[in-house]
Amino acid sequence: MSFNDKNFMLKNEPAKELYVKIAELPIYDFHCHLDPKEIFEDKVYEDIVDLWLGGDHYKWRLMRANGISEEEITGFASKLDKFKAWARTLERAFGNPLYHWSHLELRQVFGIEELLTEENAERLYHQLNTYLQEHQISPRKLIADARVAFIGTTDHPLDNLEWHKRLAEDSPIDTVVAPTFRPDEAFIEHRNFNLFIKRLEEVTEVAVRDFASFVEALGQRVSYFAQHGCRASDISFTAITYEEATLEELNDILLARMVGKEVGQSGINKWQTAIFRELCRMYKKHGFVTQVHFGALRNNHTGLFEKLGADVGVDSIGDQTCLTGNLNRLLDNLVKENALPKMIWYNLNPGYNIALANTLANFQANEEGRRSQLQFGAGWWFNDTKLGMIDQMNAYAEQGMLANFVGMLTDSRSFLSYQRHDYFRRILATYVGQWIVDEEVPEDYDRLGQFVEAISYYNAKEFFEQ
């Protein structure tokens, strides 16, 4: 067996048998950051750097660690020089998931089985660009070739969803492309909060003067998304907080923030608690799956943030106090208010895996027969690795029902990232296969085949469509 062959990452014989059952399943990519405009316009890529390196802060972060100049990462260096800089980095990136992902992409998308190195970088650069043109590689072709059944984009709550509408009306591909409601700017600590209120008023024609009118305007946007095929929401919190407030306090917090005053951490916590609760009420009404990402400390390198903006590879894993206390109180309150929607929770700090999975298990009871209505999401961001995936599945299996897990998502800005689903499926097959080897489960390939098939595709489809 050699690196990156057909049995790549399949570490035992049962894994090979299980992988065959899931290798060709469709992909249900329920959370990503792809641009629906790019999907609709479907332009053929002219340069591999635009497709492979553009906007990919995972690669940028690794290149900086390898001493590559910013000019060759995000600057004005030629595309060939940027490609060579990436090759110099990748050839030394043993142990990093990018080494695996990148070579899977080269083999599975472009048919290139040799390893990318500094020595062959220029030749492969031209070979890849020729392939793009000869095979007319475009977003829709990549989506179709990867057998993607569903794409959930991530969208600003004030987006008019023009490109989603056009895709729904006039798209030659079978893939459903649905918006996801992402209202980060509705939370009072966001730097664009006041600008968001101004634009919210313009779009909804609701004058925001107090908490109730703000919620009314937000509700109008949630309904708009629901009318245009939205199946999910998403939010990113630095930490999970819970602090009750009176309506008068919430009005005071809003008015203070609107005139530029500081509201303090307590004000931030009270607003987060209240607005998220109201949003969850709306999400349940419309049947949205509510996704929560938490634990990221963002934009830590001030110089790069000011020069390049957000999402450029300078973010960290955070920590917090009272996670389980706050989360239990929050979920309990949502249950009491009959405002608990289906949810997927993603934590960035793996030290909280067991605590999160354990807490979610407290609130699975429902009369609708929903299986694991509160999901512990796949290893996110810095945990999107072999060990990260295994740690997440261990915690889920030990504290809940891994059989109900909705599985993998790309969470990516790249149309080449669908190979991450294959990577996950290989790791899943080995993970379950090892149970067979260790005699921890019966050697029942029919039943275990259904188990891995559900996690790879069918659970997600059911969770988002029923």
Swiss-Prot record:
| The keyword Isomerase is annotated on this UniProt entry | yes
Keyword check for Isomerase, yes or no. yes
InterPro entries associated with the record: Metal_Hydrolase, Uronate_isomerase
Any single GO molecular-function term of the entry would be: glucuronate isomerase activity
**HAMAP family from the UniProt entry:** UxaC
Q: Which residues form a coiled coil?
A: none
Look up the record and give one Gene Ontology term from the biological process aspect: D-galacturonate catabolic process
Q: What is its EC number?
A: 5.3.1.12
Query: Which source organism does the UniProt entry give?
Result: Streptococcus pneumoniae (strain 70585)
Per the record, the similarity remark reads: Belongs to the metallo-dependent hydrolases superfamily. Uronate isomerase family.
- Gene designation: uxaC
Q: State the name under which the record lists this protein.
A: Uronate isomerase
Chemical reaction(s) catalysed: D-glucuronate = D-fructuronate; aldehydo-D-galacturonate = keto-D-tagaturonate
Top-level enzyme category: isomerase
Q: Cite the entry's keywords alphabetically.
A: Isomerase
Q: List the disulfide bonds.
A: none
Q: Where is the signal peptide?
A: none
Q: In which pathway does it act?
A: Carbohydrate metabolism; pentose and glucuronate interconversion
